């Protein structure tokens, strides 16, 4: 069935996914089966020689000069250094009025949220991309064979030579979770490389990480065009509420998938954490296997001795980050609100362990706090450091053995 153009503004689909997941293969498939659509394409690759663009040109989807236009963006990733270029290219393509849809294939190391934010970015004249183009669908392509092993690892992008800027301290697991949690559609690709039970378990994991996303099965990037174009699924407010940890905190519990052992638990308390005991839990116990395999945990926490600040807790795979989030509201009912998602979780043990990390009646804050000081930038309303600097603080690597507090690999800005 031909795709009807229902928008006055140019609808945009953004393809995200880690390197090798199959974004370009999916892009080739869409272009080869576009059913008469006039499609403009923006591709972005990290290398000086744009490999992804070369694959699109040389693949089975021949680009017609009269129907498609390919725009290459090199020397950076969409989410950071090339945002101005992205603004200009999307604006130009939209104003030409010659295309039914725009596909943006982001770099394998790009997070989708900043790409979406680009559409609301106001220029000097007050105009935004949203005036001429409309985000239609955020698509994340997942490699069925490698997603869980990569999520469990603690590799930094820099260790693989993938960091787009010098002080980028993001990890592969950070990126994978960000890409999944902000998706409207998750294309589960390369299913021919895993058995049916592994595929079902991965689906359950993805559904737990992002309960609102559509999960589309694919082999060699082959999907129905209508699954990724013209879905009208993207909504910023909905996207911000899509991650499983947010829905759990809001009371929208995702049904347990006991068959695959995927579950979650929510920890809440009005008491602050004892910094030393929490540090021990995070660096020595959380990834030790006694609680099951914790794939993702996130939420808000408070430390004794700095109770005026609410911290943001974010863990993906074997890496955890702790950073200031906001000045704590003294009227807030809870000091701790954490969600832990994983495989074969022992919820009772987790609850007991975290309870043991809380301050006890009559206990005073310790003189030694192993968490580095938080710089609140002198503001009563501040963002997490990654929002201000473009990258997150150095993580706690849960796979490393913490020998002393001084040499622990953590930095909270």
Description of each model-found segment:
Residues 2-174:
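Nucleotide-state-sensitive switch-loop elements of NTP-binding domains
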Residues 2-3, 48, 147, 156-337, ...:
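C-terminal accessory "lid"/substrate-recognition subdomains
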Residues 53, 83, 113-116, 196-200, ...:
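Conserved strand-to-helix beginnings and helix N-cap segments that scaffold or border functional pockets
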């Amino acid at each position: 069935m031909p795709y009807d153009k229902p928008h006055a503004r140019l609808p945009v689909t953004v393809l995200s996914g880690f390197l090798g997941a199959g974004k370009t293969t999916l892009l080739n498939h869409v272009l080869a089966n576009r059913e008469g659509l006039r499609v403009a394409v923006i591709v972005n690759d990290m290398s000086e020689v744009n490999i992804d663009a070369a694959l699109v040109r040389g693949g089975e989807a021949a680009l017609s000069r009269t129907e498609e236009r390919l725009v290459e963006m090199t020397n950076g990733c969409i989410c950071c250094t090339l945002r101005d270029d992205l603004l200009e290219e999307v604006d130009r393509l939209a104003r030409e009025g010659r295309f039914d849809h725009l596909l943006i294939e982001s770099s394998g190391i790009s997070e989708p949220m900043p790409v979406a934010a680009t559409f609301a970015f106001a220029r000097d004249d007050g105009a935004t991309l949203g005036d001429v183009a409309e985000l239609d669908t955020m698509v994340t392509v997942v490699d069925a064979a490698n997603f869980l092993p990569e999520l469990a690892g603690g590799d930094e992008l820099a260790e693989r030579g993938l960091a787009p800027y010098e002080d980028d301290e993001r990890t592969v697991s950070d990126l994978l979770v960000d890409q999944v949690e902000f998706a409207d559609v998750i294309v589960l690709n390369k299913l021919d490389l895993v058995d049916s039970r592994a595929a079902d378990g991965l689906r359950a994991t993805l559904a737990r990480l992002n309960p609102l996303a559509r999960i589309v099965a694919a082999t060699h990037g082959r999907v129905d065009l209508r699954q990724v174009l013209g879905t009208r699924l993207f909504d910023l407010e909905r996207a911000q509420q899509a991650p499983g940890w947010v829905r759990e905190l809001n009371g929208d519990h995702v049904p347990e998938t006991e068959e695959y052992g995927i579950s979650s638990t929510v920890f809440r308390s009005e008491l602050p954490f004892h910094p030393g005991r929490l540090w021990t839990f995070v660096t020595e116990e959380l990834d030790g296997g006694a609680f099951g395999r914790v794939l993702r945990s996130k939420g808000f926490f408070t430390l004794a001795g700095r109770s005026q600040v609410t911290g943001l807790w974010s863990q993906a795979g074997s890496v955890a980050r702790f950073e200031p989030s906001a000045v704590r509201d003294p009227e807030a009912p809870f000091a701790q609100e954490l969600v832990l998602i994983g495989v074969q979780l022992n919820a009772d043990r987790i609850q007991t362990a975290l309870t043991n990390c809380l301050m006890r009646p009559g206990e005073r804050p310790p003189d030694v706090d192993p968490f580095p000081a938080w710089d609140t930038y002198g503001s009563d309303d501040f963002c997490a450091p990654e929002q201000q600097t473009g990258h997150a603080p150095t993580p706690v690597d849960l796979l490393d053995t913490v020998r002393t507090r001084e040499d622990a690999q953590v930095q909270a800005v």
